[in-house]
Amino acid sequence: MKIITIWNLKGGTGKTTTTFNLAANLAKDNKMLLLDLDMQANLTSFFDIDTKKYKTNKPDISALLADDSLNVSKSIYHSRIDNIDYIKGSNDVMRLHLEDISVLGSRLSEISQEYDICIIDCHPDASILSENALAIADLVLIPINLDGFSRDNLNLVIKEIIDLEAKCGEINFKILVNKLKNLRSQRLVYKDLAENHDYPMLETSVSEYSGIQSALLRHKPLYMHRSKSLVLSLIHI
């Protein structure tokens, strides 16, 4: 099972939207597992309508990480989208006290043969829970918005990754430009990031599109313009 972790220290960069739509695209050819580590559990809210058909409430990610006697397979929900399963998030994750960065990987190893790809939606922080998700990732995808603070944010993000690499080894990460508008100011920021700094930028970007919010309100994925090229970029990394 390949693991893609969606993470940034900054909120509002489109992590959850990226997770949801990337999973919907990849699910055409892969069996997907989504994991919601954000304490706001927004990814879970996209699928919560599906939980009504279950007679019992399954353990969420907080319960699984707090109690290793729980069966991971019995915590999985099947979504309304073919080939996408998920484990529910919970705001209780903020109260978890994990001992090291191997806990999440250990739990996911129990079901690694059942899925092709797992995508993890992280809370925007540098907690040990986020470190767990970063340490086990085959790819860390960092969505950013192009604004005057992009470089400062990326410097903090990369410092955190470098610090974590001292504990877990090399981390493969790429930067995805999200919510792109055709503005001169954004073009200048992108040029600065791509040409003047050694940031691992994905060539593909995701344009801001009014239909995205409408799709999210309906809890439906949006097959965004150029989303296919984003998926192909990830597959070949």
How should each PLM-predicted stretch be described?
Residues 1-235:
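P-loop NTP-binding core
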